[in-house]
């Protein structure tokens, strides 16, 4: 299982003082040199962490895979087409939320997703949908032309009861198996950390996990390189 590192909170720390450091581009390079298979950044509409200039520099420097998380808006689509990330992940976005709170409602937005994804594909940009691990969402992801699904692990990460954890892992397993059956590539993310990620390894259909906050928090104490290497060891 591979590791993609979300570097949003390097930018959060930088922006807390409106300074130039720490630099998310440097952090991304260190993550790659330490074995990360990809870099994830979320260009939010309010630009609360990653800025447009960060995205431009990341596109110019990332050597593995650049995954741009973004809301499904005209502005973001234009930015994606101009920047040409290796992957676009469509996520829900609310200005008042601290972090993404759930999967994209692909069922009610199905008719909007089809032309949106098609235009990105016409420019050579594959699309991933950040979704809840349900058969209905996976079916729609197939129908609208997504190449990937990112299964939302937020509920799993919050559970405490072993019985509930096992039930959620089974739900993730069933979703991943169905997605794979439909020809989708499967990744997972949200709320994963150094304590709960090992269990996700059991789901063989998940080829990569996207981890941000927990890894960046660890990096503030022990450095980016060691934080990345430690997570990779857990995934192997």
UniProtKB/Swiss-Prot annotation:
EC annotation from Swiss-Prot or TrEMBL: 2.6.99.2
Residues given in the record as 1-deoxy-D-xylulose 5-phosphate binding sites: 8-9, 44, 49, 99
Locations listed in the record: Cytoplasm
Keyword list, A-Z: Cytoplasm, Pyridoxine biosynthesis, Transferase
A Pfam family annotated for this UniProt entry: PdxJ
Pathway stated in the Swiss-Prot or TrEMBL entry: Cofactor biosynthesis; pyridoxine 5'-phosphate biosynthesis; pyridoxine 5'-phosphate from D-erythrose 4-phosphate: step 5/5
Positions marked as site (Transition state stabilizer): 150
Active site per UniProt: 42 (proton acceptor), 69 (proton acceptor), 190 (proton donor)
GO biological processes: pyridoxine biosynthetic process
Reactions it catalyzes: 3-amino-2-oxopropyl phosphate + 1-deoxy-D-xylulose 5-phosphate = pyridoxine 5'-phosphate + phosphate + 2 H2O + H(+)
Source species, domain of life: Bacteria
Positions annotated to bind 3-amino-2-oxopropyl phosphate: 6, 17, 191, 212-213
Top enzyme class: transferase
One of the record's GO cellular component terms: cytosol
Any GO MF annotation of the entry: pyridoxine 5'-phosphate synthase activity
Primary location recorded for the protein, binned into one broad class: cytoplasm
Annotated InterPro entries: Aldolase_TIM, PyrdxlP_synth_PdxJ, Pyridoxine-5'_phos_synth
Similarity section: Belongs to the PNP synthase family.
Record text on subunit structure and interactions: Homooctamer; tetramer of dimers.
Cited PANTHER family: PYRIDOXINE 5'-PHOSPHATE SYNTHASE
Entry function: Catalyzes the complicated ring closure reaction between the two acyclic compounds 1-deoxy-D-xylulose-5-phosphate (DXP) and 3-amino-2-oxopropyl phosphate (1-amino-acetone-3-phosphate or AAP) to form pyridoxine 5'-phosphate (PNP) and inorganic phosphate.
NCBIfam families cross-referenced by the UniProt entry: pdxJ (TIGR00559), PRK05265.1-3 (NF003625), PRK05265.1-5 (NF003627)
Protein name: Pyridoxine 5'-phosphate synthase
Organism: Chloroherpeton thalassium (strain ATCC 35110 / GB-78)
Gene from which this protein is expressed: pdxJ
